[in-house]
Structures are given as structure tokens and as C-alpha cells.
Amino acid sequence: MLDLIQTRRDLHQIPEIGLEEFKTQAYLLDVIEKLTTGKDFVQIRTWRTGILVYLQGSQPERTIGWRTDIDGLPIVEQTGLPFASQHQGRMHACGHDFHMTIALGCLERALEEQPKNNLLFLFQPAEENEAGGMLMYEDGAFGDWLPNQFYGLHVRPDLKVGQIATNTHTLFAGTCEVKIRFKGKGGHAAFPHEANDALVAASYFVTQVQSVVSRNVNPIEGAVVTFGVFQAGTTNNVITDTAFLHGTIRALTQDMSLLVQKRVKTVAEGVAAAFDMEVEVELKQGGYLPVENNPALARELMDFFDEKDGIELIDIEPAMTGEDFGYLLSKVDGVMFWLGIDSPYALHHPQMSPKEEVLAIGVAAVSSFLKKKAAE
């Protein structure tokens, strides 16, 4: 039987950035091959650093998918744990070591007997930086194994162990990276009339763009436009010719995201025109679409967990954080949910350390749900 705590600790020590998860993939394949030995209804494929494990059903009517992400973050771990990261500047600070361990535990239980329906376990790379789910889908990695329904979870530090939270609509926002560069004309601070100050134009844009959400988004809906980087100039008495802004757009529906993206671009171009200068606008959403749960499947999952002993189900509001599972759920109906890990530190914090007792709880809950779906 798989030692869940040791497996998690092994994986925690080898975090790798997206599409560089070579040690992680090798570790996972070793475990998977041991679990599947002698199981003639199992097939395994790899895609770059990802892994797909397919359980052929005995009388399949559909394919049920379970997705887990496998990459780490470029963070220096500060937990002080004896099993802390052995990769300098890399850490499993988003709980993907927990995600992988729970998936392996569920795979072990699913292998106890051949399921009626097909089951697909996806170990997906590059959730954090490259939208690995989109890359796999667009590259045809699923082939005829593409699920009819897709499920997945994400750990959440502010929920207690034993709590599961989701809803019947949007769980995560869609996110879009924004880069804007204003190009004016530099000059001496004493002669502003001979220059065209990109810093002033960019500052004007920062204030004007605040109206995009307040005057274009229904107050009942949600959207965010935030610029966290503003770079302009090199010294106090020189008017800069360029100003660079780097920010993010977040929205709870894809239609709203596209509207906000369009308005941000329009405002930037309008400001540039008003100041008679050039502007470059780069919008990069990629595969980070809103994670929109299928209402009927979400209600089924919520009802199932609500009746499970030891589980407290929470109907939760959407989060404005992003998750690339949204891309796969735009192609396949499915559900994502939060799993409580009771950590005082947030996701992506260098001291984030979940409670390990959640591993057994997560495996028991998820595997029972997957067995139910596989038997339908």
C-alpha cells in the first residue's frame, strides 16, 4: 500500500518549474509502473514531462478524467522542514506535491478492480507558468482518451482539514497578463516643450484605466485591473522617452475578460493619441480561462460529498486567483473544488506547509467519488 506521507515528502523535495519536471516525472512513472504491474487494462502515455494513465473500462459508456498538476514554483523554501526542497530556489509552495500524492492514492484504489467506465489520470505539467493543459490539448496529447467529464482539486490553506468547498458556477477567475509601453520623446527636464513625456502619459493611463471596471462591469459581477509594475526614467532631470507598465486582468467569465481586455487596450491607445505618442499593448491570456464548473455535475459532486462522513461541504464564492484547469473545462464538462489543508501561510508563501493528515482524507473522498462515477 502506498505510503502517502512518504510519497508527499519525496515529491516535496524535488520541485521543478513547468516543462522541466524531469525528476518529478521519473518519480511518478516509477510509482505508477509499480502500482499497475499485472493490470492488463492499463495503458500509460507520456507527453513531454506529463503523464497520462488510462484504465480501460469493462463496459465503458464514457471516460471520467482526474487531473493533477505537478510543477513547483521559483521560491526559496523557508519551512525548515527536514524534507524541505533540495532544489535551490524551487518549492512546492502551491501544494502540487499534495495534489500528486492524492492522485497516486486514488489511482491505487481505482486499480483494485477493472472499472466499468474508462478512467483517465492526468499528471499535467506547467500549470503555473505555461498553461500546460492547453499545450497538451492543442498538441493532441489526449487522442481518443479525452474524457467526457473532467475533475480536479486544489488545496486551500484557509480551509480546515476535512472541508471541501466548491460551487455550481465559477471557482477561479480567468487571468490575463498585460504589458504596455508608451513611447514618447526624451529631453532635458528644463525644456519639457521639446520633449514628449512618456511618464506623464503612462501616469494619466493608470488613473484613467481605473474606470474600466467601475464603469464597464456590472457591480454584481467581478473583474480586476491591477498594474503592479511601473518603470520609467533613469535620473531626476531627464524626461524619459519610454514608460513600461506590467499588470493583470482578472474576470469571472470569459466574455467579461474579453470586454475588459478590449477596454484596457482602447484606453491605452486613447491616452497615447491624446499625448501624440506611440503605445504597444500586449495581452496574454493563453490557457488561463475562468474555471467554470458544470452546474449539474457540480451539484452531483456537492451532494455526494455532503453525505460523506468526515467531510464538511462549503458552497463557496469564486476566487480571483487563476488556474489553467479552466482551459480544459472549456473543452470538457467538469468540476474543480477546494480541499482544506489548514495552513497559517497562504499559497505561494515560502513557509506554506499543509497538514499531512489531509492526504488520507483526500484520497478517501476523491477515490470514492471516482469509483461511483466509474460504476455508473
Swiss-Prot record:
Q: What Gene3D superfamilies does this protein map onto?
A: 3.30.70.360, Zn peptidases (3.40.630.10)
EC number from the UniProt entry: 3.5.1.47
The UniProt keyword set, sorted, is:
Amino-acid biosynthesis, Diaminopimelate biosynthesis, Hydrolase, Lysine biosynthesis
Q: In which pathway does it act?
A: Amino-acid biosynthesis; L-lysine biosynthesis via DAP pathway; LL-2,6-diaminopimelate from (S)-tetrahydrodipicolinate (acetylase route): step 3/3
Active-site residues (renumbered): 69, 128
Q: Name one GO biological process term.
A: diaminopimelate biosynthetic process
Q: Which InterPro entries does the entry link to?
A: AcetylDAP_deacetylase, Amidohydrolase, Bact_exopeptidase_dim_dom, Peptidase_M20, Peptidase_M20_dimer
Q: Name one Pfam family in it.
A: Peptidase_M20
**Briefly, what is this protein's role?**
Catalyzes the conversion of N-acetyl-diaminopimelate to diaminopimelate and acetate.
* Similarity field: Belongs to the peptidase M20A family. N-acetyldiaminopimelate deacetylase subfamily.
Q: What NCBIfam families does the database record attribute to this sequence?
A: amidohydrolases
- Official protein name in the record: N-acetyldiaminopimelate deacetylase
**Provenance organism:** Streptococcus pneumoniae (strain 70585)
